[in-house]
Amino acid sequence: MSYHVDRFYAAVSVLAGHGHIKQRLINAYEDNLVAICEDELPISVKQSFSDLKHLMNRVTPLNGEGTICASVRKMSVEEAADCAVSVVTLYHEISRVDAGREAVLPLDSKDRSSVPPFLVKSN
């Protein structure tokens, strides 16, 4: 999961940079989020990320322009800002979930040798 946290952090960093919001949104999404599959994300953010992905890919490109560029070009400044807020909100939620993860112990009885003896329940 920390890979996704890192990707969203990088996207938020781009969004916080200089330049027009539409160009920052394009760069943040294309460089950091485009390769993320919503099925890899926590359940609590799957739908929000899917919605963002839909917004970023909803326009058919023209003249060699990419889908993301075309979609953001058709957005108003307010819509682009809302998408940027969605990225920040997703980053916050993914970070919160990642920080709250507990260590997962192996369930396979063959792997009990890697579990400290005081944690193994005797049968």
Spans of features found by a protein language model:
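Amphipathic alpha-helical interaction modules
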Residues: 19-67
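Short terminal alpha-helical segments
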Residues: 1-31, 84-88
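Long, hydrophobic, amphipathic alpha-helical segments used as structural scaffolds
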Residues: 16-19, 23, 37-40, 91-105
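Acidic-enriched, low-complexity/disordered segments with a strong bias for Aspartate over Glutamate
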Residues: 6, 31, 39, 51, ...
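Non-transmembrane, amphipathic alpha-helical segments
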Residues: 7-17, 37-44, 68-82
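Amphipathic alpha-helical binding modules
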Residues: 70-123
